[in-house]
Amino acid sequence: QSIPNSAPLEYIKNLFDNYAFQFDAHLQNILLYKTPELLREQLNPFLENKKYKLLDLGCGTGLSGQCFSDIAKKIIGMDISRNMLNKAKEKACYDILIEKDILSGIPELAENFDLVLCIDTLVYFGNLNDFFEKIIVCLQVNGLLAFSVELANEAATSYLLQTNGRYQHAETYIKELAEKKPLKLLRYASVIGRQQDNEAIQTGLFIFKKI
């Protein structure tokens, strides 16, 4: 039986509409979530002395926006969950918030960006080819793409669907997909992004530059 390309959109929307009200506290206090901060550490050496036009895909409640707002002249956040976006609005670090799933929302954007973030969002997508295809269009030449995935075991060659509904991706799968696009890998790191049921979740952090 083949693995679905992604989680159903209605499932994602309902999950996070219901999760939004305790999301920040649960992630930070229970799951010890720190992926935005870890990705920022990896990205810092490649940042220029300028303010970026930033697109935050799957922005959720805005934890990532908070972590990167100091380097942004403009931040657009996109998420499928209205309740999550309402929480992001309270953080007052976004210029525009868009209620849309990312794959259909990216092509509707009327501008390009020099920094695109996608943190803890690709866990709801298995096949990432469409994601890369759409990102290339909205990313400026020399623009940066920074994202996270949950890492699959070393035996995996592409992606796995876990029983919790989240996907894991193989490091080699990501790199091979990107090699077919005008993207140069600047940094890859394997880190502990959060805890789940007392287990450390191996997270892959990727930073690419459009060439």
Briefly describe each language-model feature range.
Residues 1-13:
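N-terminal auxiliary segments of SAM/dcSAM-dependent transferases
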Residues 25-41:
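Conserved SAM-binding loop and adjacent beta-strand
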Residues 55, 59-105:
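Class I SAM-dependent methyltransferase SAM/SAH-binding core
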Residues 117-118:
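A conserved beta-strand element that flanks and buttresses the S-adenosyl-L-methionine
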Residues 129-144:
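A short glycine-rich, Lys/Arg-flanked "PGG" loop and its adjoining helix->strand segment in the class I
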Residues 147-167:
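Short, glycine-/aromatic-enriched active-site segment of Class I SAM-dependent methyltransferases
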Residues 166-181, 188:
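Short alpha-helix
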Residues 193-211:
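Core SAM-dependent methyltransferase catalytic element
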